[in-house]
């Protein structure tokens, strides 16, 4: 069974049942000791792309949002049992051509890492994806706030929705997370793990 470890802010790690390790948006917190087989970076803002945190395993691959889209077309890939594809993520602070979300599948579980985004035209299509875990930003400064994220969660219809990116340069703000409402809501605090 795959496992998610939340480092804080927008940073998290997923370890497959076979022990392969993927990091998304490395920046905040600890828990970077396991060598990375795969790293996904949703955008190039400093709080999403600190590769100095990562020790790369032999053959590690890094996929950056800017390389996964031109704003119209979106790439996909597969590495060590992780299947992933980029999807639109954008708002007034993030251009369509520079930022993406990722849908990741591993061990029969589907995860949506929204990246820095607000509501997108693509989100209604996510309802048909049967997403198990949606990780949604909620800070309301560089992306949508908790109320808008709650509305997006209702559209996406993931089995579980997790509020992240709750406050700039802060691992986690429980007050913001408490304002996020969604069926199957999970609150995961920095340093906590969940079985997927």
Name every feature range the model reports, one short phrase each.
Residues 36-47:
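Metallo-beta-lactamase
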Residues 14, 43, 84, 116, ...:
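Divalent metal-coordination and catalytic microenvironments
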Residues 1-34, 38, 65-128, 144, ...:
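Core dinuclear metal-dependent hydrolase active-site scaffold
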Residues 120-196:
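Cap/insert and terminal regions of metallo-dependent hydrolase folds
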Residues 20, 56-62, 156-160, 183:
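A short helix->loop->beta-strand "cap" motif at the edges of active sites that frequently abuts
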Residues 32-34, 52-59, 127-130, 152-157:
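Short, conserved loop/helix-junction motifs that constitute active-site signature segments
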Residues 50-59, 171-179:
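Metal-dependent catalytic neighborhoods of phosphoester/phosphodiester hydrolases
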Residues 41, 59-67, 160-165:
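Short internal beta-strands
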